[in-house]
Design a protein with these regions (language model features):
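Active-site/ligand-binding neighborhood in enzyme catalytic cores
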Residues: 11-142, 146-153
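Mid-domain catalytic core of redox enzymes
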Residues: 127-213
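Beta-hairpin (beta-strand-turn-beta-strand) motif
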Residues: 9-11, 195
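Short, small-residue-biased leader/transition segments that mark boundaries at the very start
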Residues: 2-7
Length: 213
């Protein structure tokens, strides 16, 4: 099942750089990145150039290129540079994606949280807002539309390109499948981007879902 033999930490940090290059200090990692980013001169013009300028070509080729092109269906040279700028790069051993002081996931997951928020609120399903716009707009002072923006404006500026996401759910007779909440598959050949094992999002639980002492 697993098309890989090596695991890297993400977002990119000292664990990533140690596994990729064998470096052990921030100074060594910074020097390695600086050596590889020299091929990019001037302001990066696309995602490939931006990625190389951030972390060097080795990490770009191994962990960014295939994954990104699989997600977007475009060559990295044809994608804008700003897409990759949001990805943290740290010369520390911090694995957190975000820098916020307080971070967390609702106990029981977001489904339970939303269910509690909707308690006592009318919910209508399978209703196309655009087909019933005049009626629905009278129900509130403000309406938040979350559908396709080009459809909202009746495609006056043309049709936007969209990338769809397909979710496949499997229940396995295993207490521990991959040992982590998310494992991303960064090669171009694997036909999926990641596998999620939801139980590991619940902090303070063991592999059987029991509370840790």
């Amino acid at each position: 099942l697993f098309p890989y033999t090596t695991l890297f930490r993400s977002p990119f940090n000292m664990y990533t750089f140690n596994k990729m290059w064998g470096v052990v200090t921030p100074e060594e990692a910074a020097a390695k990145i600086e050596e590889q980013r020299k091929e990019i001169t001037g302001e990066p013009q696309n995602l490939e150039e931006q990625a190389i300028s951030l972390v060097g070509r080795d990490i770009y080729e191994k962990l960014i290129k295939g994954y990104t092109e699989k997600q977007w269906g475009r060559d990295c040279k044809d994608l804008p540079s700003f897409i990759i700028k949001r990805l943290p790069v740290r010369l520390t051993f911090d694995n957190n994606y975000f820098n916020a002081l307080y971070q967390g996931i609702p106990v029981g997951g977001y489904t339970k949280m939303i269910a509690n928020l909707l308690d006592g609120i009318e919910v209508r399903l399978n209703i196309d807002y655009l087909e019933h716009k005049s009626e629905l707009d009278t129900l509130a002072d403000k309406v938040v539309y979350t559908g396709p923006i080009d459809a909202y404006f009746d495609y006056k500026l043309g049709t936007l390109e969209y990338r769809s996401v397909r979710f496949e759910t499997e229940t396995l007779d295993k207490s521990n499948f991959q040992g982590n909440a998310a494992v991303n598959y960064t090669d171009r050949e694997t036909p999926w981007t990641r596998i999620i094992e939801h139980k590991w999002f619940e902090f303070g639980k063991d592999e059987n879902g029991n509370d840790l002492p």
